[in-house]
């Protein structure tokens, strides 16, 4: 499994990079689960990582606003992100998801076809009034997305595993692979979840709180990144 670590600034990005993360992800927790950070922060992170890892950037937890989302996605791509991540938050139907993701993908790929688009559903979709992550792989594949992900929409300490069980997450992973997509799992993951994640088999796991010592509002610690890298590679 690849490890995606989400710093909030260039100082944390250096720690994540030196610690051995496979992907350095720029987000802004103050603005939500997949809260967008500023273009200059993406550029700063890109500069300090200096090619050691690809950079991903979140553009927000989006309801049905394809134009706004497409423009935000292009902004993240221009700022230097290699992966552009969008959360489908309060998306009511598969047709809404398809249009949103199609427009985002076009905005990114017209600029640079080598950049990857990541579509995230939410394990707690029922409490945020959005579509099931199990519907996402088929829609994402049709839209030309590269990676599908599941995360928690509400960051209250509850884990993805409290909303989707091993069977459902395995189904999500297998569906993604059946459509030729990479997939990722995130959402208040803990070190003790690693054996379960290995059974499920995602390509990528996404973390912040786990490498902050359990509190995503504190700072990333290099020794915890290194510990997690070792466990993911074991």
Curated annotation (Swiss-Prot):
Protein name: (5-formylfuran-3-yl)methyl phosphate synthase
Biological function: Catalyzes the formation of 4-(hydroxymethyl)-2-furancarboxaldehyde phosphate (4-HFC-P) from two molecules of glyceraldehyde-3-P (GA-3-P).
Name of one Pfam family that matches: 4HFCP_synth
Principal EC category: lyase
Pathway the protein takes part in: Cofactor biosynthesis; methanofuran biosynthesis
Gene: mfnB
One GO BP annotation of this record: methanofuran biosynthetic process
Keywords: Lyase, Schiff base
E.C. number(s) listed in UniProt: 4.2.3.153
Active site: 27, 85
